[in-house]
Amino acid sequence: MVSLCIKDNNTKIQDFLMKKIGESNIPDIYYSKHIFKLYENVIIHYKGKDFQKFYKFLSNLLSDAIINYYEPTIVKRLILKDYFYFDALDRNSIYNEYNILHHNSKKYINKDILDYIENHKSIVLNGFVNFRLSNYKNSLEPLVESAVSKFVLDKEYLEFVSLLRGYVDSKIPEPIKIHLIYSNKESILLDENYNMLEFEDFNSEYLSDISFSQNDYALNTLIGKLPESIYIHLISPKDEYIETLELIFGKRI
């Protein structure tokens, strides 16, 4: 028989462990919860013979517990430590961006836990996270950096759209109609008689070294002409560019 005592005082973690152990399909597992001195303990006994399967189950279980209940705090501390100059609302937005990112932090935890529980009869979960999972915590830092980059780009994008929307709303529209044909992420502009319109150039010496896409020129032309109505004809599905036009020109579309 092999046994493991999992020590942690987080009630949610205790309940999570008890629930998942109870749902396991591994025979010959016996478990209970007791309070001894400083910690609440989940005690697991295994009387079977497939030790590899048992330890693999435990390492997966503890990895899930760490990701679900410890990782949010670790990530928020990383954001606060490295990006303290953002206010609380922005830091929360960065954390939300982090949660959207696809990542597999579990692979950085499993082996360390497996190596430990195969050689120890008890594990203090909080101490293990704080002192034995450096590879795992290091793996979170580039993900936080990616979340910050995404947040900054999104914020700049919203500020850009807001600026253009303010400019468009401040101008009296011209009594013309323009059709925009959108296909394969490229735009074609037609006047109300369906004649092709030439794109207006970016008239600034400071932008001479920047490479603009066809859609950039189309947007610049629409802003320059300020039509009262824009008809969008989608050959390809709507994407972020079309959504940007809708945000900038509003009811004119």
List each language-model region with its residue ranges.
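C-terminal structured domains
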Residues: 193-253
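Conserved mixed alpha/beta catalytic, RNA-binding, or beta-rich assembly cores of soluble enzyme
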Residues: 1-216
